[in-house]
A protein has these predicted regions:
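Betabetaalpha-Me/HNH-type nuclease active-site subdomain
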Residues: 62
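Glycine-rich beta-strand-to-loop/alpha-helix junction loops that act as flexible
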Residues: 55-59
Length: 285
């Protein structure tokens, strides 16, 4: 897909326009989907930290596994915490709640410093070499663990942003994962135009994402009344509903060990006073 990224803009526009007509979607969505896939291919095959990342979240459910139909436009990534200087098991060491909170804050600060001072500069250099001044990369003003990529765009749609958000965190679990094949919509319709129509991406299994979303909604069920409900959480209900229509539900429900690992991880690294994670089990969730 790198060859499509570097062809004249008018030729890409024609490709996206024709794909949109065939698929009954807006040109802007076809265009952004291409750049999401291009970024995934870059991150996992050409980026300096290609071996230190894993793909997770809603976009993985749609692009890697075809489990949901909503257009997921952000890329959620796990960064190996060894990149930040931690030993492979160091974050799991026993600590008091107070010391664990201090560790978690320090880990997040290290991640933010790495993204701002090292990762961003490397990505800018690499993408500029491919795309020239047509791409802009910067840290989100409101979230220092998010890198925004303003990709070359020819189409607009009020329902989507003309940028890709790379949401990158080190306090996330790597397993279980598999290598998944990811293909942009344009390559599904016009694969012969692509020298590389798809890309292999190390991706968290949907069964873990299932339990991640179940535990999110379990926590929200106990949210204290004086604490405002977070925005954009309807997606978790939708994603979980769609996964429950597939074998992912049965696979996840049969894997109590995976549920325990998800709960233990959240309780250690994302402790929440009202979440009642101790009550989570198949009989209570």
């Amino acid at each position: 897909m790198r060859n499509i990224a570097t062809i004249p803009a008018r030729d890409r526009e024609a490709l996206f326009r024709n794909t949109a007509a065939k698929m009954g979607m807006s040109e802007a969505i076809i265009e952004k989907d291409f750049w999401v896939c291009y970024m995934l291919d870059y991150l996992f095959h050409r980026c300096a930290w290609k071996d230190n990342l894993a793909f997770k979240g809603g976009t993985s459910l749609s692009k890697a596994y075809g489990l949901i139909e909503r257009f997921s436009e952000d890329i959620d990534l796990i960064l190996d915490w060894r990149v930040l200087g931690y030993g492979i098991n160091e974050p799991w060491e026993q600590r008091s709640n107070t010391k664990q909170d201090i560790f978690n804050k320090e880990a997040n600060t290290r991640a933010e410093d790495f993204l701002r001072d090292t990762f961003l500069h490397s990505v800018v250099a690499d993408l500029t070499a491919d795309l020239g001044d047509n791409v802009k990369c910067f840290i989100d003003d409101n979230d220092p663990q998010t890198v925004k990529i303003a990709y070359p765009n020819s189409f607009s749609d009020m329902s989507i942003l003309q940028e890709i958000r790379l949401e990158i965190g080190a306090l996330a679990a790597w397993t279980p994962v598999k290598v998944a094949d990811i293909t942009p919509y344009a390559a599904q319709e016009y694969g012969r135009l692509f020298k590389q129509p798809s890309t292999d991406i190390l991706t968290v299994l949907p069964e873990r994402t299932f339990w991640e979303k179940v535990t999110i909604l379990h926590r929200e069920a106990f949210r204290e009344e004086d604490r405002p409900f977070p925005t954009r959480y309807s997606r978790h209900y939708y994603d979980l509903y769609r996964m429950m229509q597939t074998e992912v539900k049965d696979n996840a429900l049969a894997d109590n060990d995976l549920l325990t690992k998800v709960v233990d991880f959240k309780d250690k690294f994302y402790r929440c006073p009202w979440a009642r994670y101790d009550q989570i089990g198949r009989a209570h969730v």
